[in-house]
């Protein structure tokens, strides 16, 4: 997989399509000739707000698109191996709260010696009362134990975590409860949608 500007442009085009499509919901309702309904106005404002947020996110993460080493140097460490149709997850444990310019998790695709940033991600212990991004869609990740090499063992409590991964022997890193996830496919086109948890276009990289 060769990183190219065309992939970035295509991803941004699909992001814009997703944003415009979301903003078009309810646009057919009119309160009178030539007058948009309140629903249309609200959708338009939401679309504009999302475009602005995504622009901030892209500006902040462009340095990581093909530079995993920089991400590591800036505190992102591996927390999963390749999750099919998703990617390798790298987390910066020092990033707290929601700031679109500072995603705590970067999701990479890998082939050969090349790494491509596909998505950025946030996790929550419960679904946010107010979506942090307009139109946000959520996924889920079950409770489990993470190990230093990115391997993962499902476990309902930290006490149930083996001290080392049963298969790789890697040392225990951390445990987390059931989580609500928010993916944003900012750097790789995703026909399933900007906020989809998985991406069929990265299936080719499921085996690294």
Predicted feature residues:
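Intrinsically disordered, low-complexity regions of eukaryotic proteins
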Residues: 22-25, 38
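Sec-dependent signal peptide cleavage junction
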Residues: 24-33
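Bacterial N-terminal signal peptides that target proteins for export
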Residues: 2-11
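Primary mode marks residue(s) on the alpha4-beta5-alpha5 output face of response regulator receiver
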Residues: 32-208
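Bacterial N-terminal signal peptides
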Residues: 11-23
């Amino acid at each position: 997989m060769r990183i190219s500007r065309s992939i970035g442009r295509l991803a941004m085009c699909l992001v814009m399509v997703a944003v415009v499509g979301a903003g078009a919901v309810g646009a057919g309702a009119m309160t009178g000739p030539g007058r948009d309904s309140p629903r249309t106005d609200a959708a338009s404002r939401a679309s504009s707000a999302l475009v602005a947020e995504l622009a901030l996110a892209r500006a902040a993460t462009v340095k990581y698109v093909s530079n995993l080493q920089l991400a590591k140097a800036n505190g992102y460490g591996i927390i999963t191996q390749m999750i099919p149709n998703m990617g390798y997850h790298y987390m910066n444990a020092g990033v707290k709260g929601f700031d679109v310019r500072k995603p705590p998790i970067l999701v990479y695709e890998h082939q050969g010696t090349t790494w491509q940033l596909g998505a950025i991600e946030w996790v929550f212990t419960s679904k946010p009362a107010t979506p942090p991004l307009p139109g946000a869609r959520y996924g889920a990740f079950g409770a489990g134990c993470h190990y230093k090499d990115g391997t993962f063992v499902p476990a309902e409590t930290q006490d149930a975590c083996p001290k080392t991964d049963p298969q790789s022997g890697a040392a225990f890193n951390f445990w987390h409860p059931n989580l609500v996830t928010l993916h944003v496919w900012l750097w790789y086109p995703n026909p399933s949608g900007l906020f989809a948890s998985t991406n069929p276009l990265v299936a080719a990289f499921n085996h690294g």
